[in-house]
Every structure is written in structure tokens, then in C-alpha cells.
Amino acid sequence: MEFQNRINSLRSTLSKTDIDTAFISNKDNIRYYSGFTGTLAFLLISETKSIIITDSRYTIRAQEECPDYEIYQLKSGDNWIENSTNQIKSKVIGFEGNFVSFNLLNQLKERSNNNLIWKDFSEQITKERIIKSEHEVK
């Protein structure tokens, strides 16, 4: 329930911007929004969908730890960026500019739909993370 509340809060924040989907790559933020404890994952969170992208080593863990998420399993040679963003039908994706490397951002742009716009939304995520649950404070 705690994770669903956080997702809903993020969705509310996104609705006040021109960003329709959040791309989350920082491990701490992935855990904050999903509970996922594996070492390789990305999240895509839109108004209606929550997708966790991970490889076959963590598929079962993702199913167990992230029941509110659709699982997108990475496969060799798969254009996961385009395929997963097409599932959400995004126009503008917010990314954590303070964590996404220049090279990763270029890959995201090159491998996604050409009409897709990528925008830094680090400030919004930082504000979201200020909110702490009782469990986090302990």
C-alpha cells in the first residue's frame, strides 16, 4: 500500500507538469517507488501504468516484490527502450538528470521513438522523496 501511495503521489506531481511518464533509474528511487531490491532495473510510471524493466535474473524477484507493476524482461538484442515506452504511449518522459549519464541519455534518445521528448525532472523527484513514511524514519 505504501508503494501505491508513493506512485499516486508521483502521478499527481506529473499531472502538474508537461511530463506524462517518469523514467526512474536510481536504485534508491526504484526501491522507494517499487520495493524492488535487485541491482538492475528501471521504472516507467505513467498516469495509468507502472512498468519495471529488469533482466531474467530478477524477473521472479520483481514479480514477488512489485505486485503493482507490469514486468518487462530485458532480452539480448531487444530495443527495450522503444518497446517499453511504446507500451505507455508517452510523449514527454521525465528522467533523473542528476543520475542519468550523458551516454545513457543519448542511448535513450537514440533508441526511443523520434517524437519522444526527454526532460530532466530531478527537482520533482527530490521534492517527492522528502516525504518520509514512519518505516523510513525508524
Region annotations inferred by a language model:
Residues 1-86, 132-138:
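N-terminal accessory/capping or targeting/presequence segment of soluble
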Residues 2, 7, 48, 79-138:
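Flexible, acidic/His-enriched mid-domain "rim/lid" segments that flank
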